Amino acid sequence: MMLAVEDVLSELAGEERNERGLPPGFRFHPTDEELITFYLASKIFHGGLSGIHISEVDLNRCEPWELPEMAKMGEREWYFYSLRDRKYPTGLRTNRATTAGYWKATGKDKEVFSGGGGQLVGMKKTLVFYKGRAPRGLKTKWVMHEYRLENDHSHRHTCKEEWVICRVFNKTGDRKNVGLIHNQISYLHNHSLSTTHHHHHEALPLLIEPSNKTLTNFPSLLYDDPHQNYNNNNFLHGSSGHNIDELKALINPVVSQLNGIIFPSGNNNNDEDDFDFNLGVKTEQSSNGNEIDVRDYLENPLFQEASYGLLGFSSSPGPLHMLLDSPCPLGFQL
């Protein structure tokens, strides 16, 4: 055990002890085997250990939430010596009741071996504290591991009120799950900031589904620069009608639905002028010959509710002029 050596070294160095009797930085986290073969055995056969302060408590007279203040060892887990209180003078059943509730055993007792699977040295019992009285007690987060000697070690101690050593702790939350959720939230937050700052055009669903054929016919679509203007007149009017129809066929149906909302008169033809709206032309001719400003329609609250629903938003993310001034997927601009 290195604790005694560290005690001597810390005293020679003049280190200040903490309130638990350990040098700064030391924590009391013994294994199941160490609790039984060293601490419990020393208590039973030698009355305890010099310099190791583990409190003796009567677990039937103390509620679990009172135990941390009584402990001399442990921070998140608290350790105690206790005498098993027999329920009946001639019986072997243990009294587990307190004033506010009772300890109830859960699962089977676990065998504790020495040397990684060697000799059986003791048993470990897990108990959970319930408020109230059985069988209608209310389960709490307080858990106790009770360790006792077994086999040859237990036969050496003939006293019926045998000593046990207990580890008590409160399961007030699964730290692994909390950590996972925190990491997920941090990832989503950082990913959102990165996407908004560097790839703002990815905030909307893709309106173009590229294919190998399209990328061959239109090399400019290979570039993913949101500030590059791909809807110039040279591109539109210098291309054949076949190529334009091929490009129009790749437009997501969302665009067609938006056009249907803005121009319900069915003024959609299969010519190049009709295709101009999808590529950024902001005016259109109505059925009576008057020029229509597309922004008037886009700023209409009824249109905003309908169009954002088609784009997958539950509600409008902000003023529409911000969306109009922002880069759209693959260079398209509304």
Swiss-Prot record:
Residues 121-177 bind DNA. One of its GO terms (biological process) is organ boundary specification between lateral organs and the meristem. GO terms for cellular component: nucleus. Its main location: nucleus. InterPro entries: NAC-dom, NAC_dom_sf. In a general manner, present at the boundaries between mersitems and araising primordia. Keywords: Developmental protein, DNA-binding, Nucleus, Transcription, Transcription regulation. It is found in: Nucleus. Disulfide bonds: none annotated. It holds the Pfam family NAM. SUPFAM superfamilies: NAC domain. Induction: By BRM, at the chromatin level, and conferring a very specific spatial expression pattern. It comes from the Eukaryota. GO terms for molecular function: DNA-binding transcription factor activity; transcription cis-regulatory region binding. The keyword Cell cycle does not apply. Residues 22-171 form the NAC domain. Transcription activator. Involved in molecular mechanisms regulating shoot apical meristem (SAM) formation during embryogenesis and organ separation. Required for axillary meristem initiation and separation of the meristem from the main stem. May act as an inhibitor of cell division. The NAC domain includes a DNA-binding domain and a dimerization domain, and confers the specificity of the transactivated target genes. This is Protein CUP-SHAPED COTYLEDON 3. It comes from Arabidopsis thaliana.
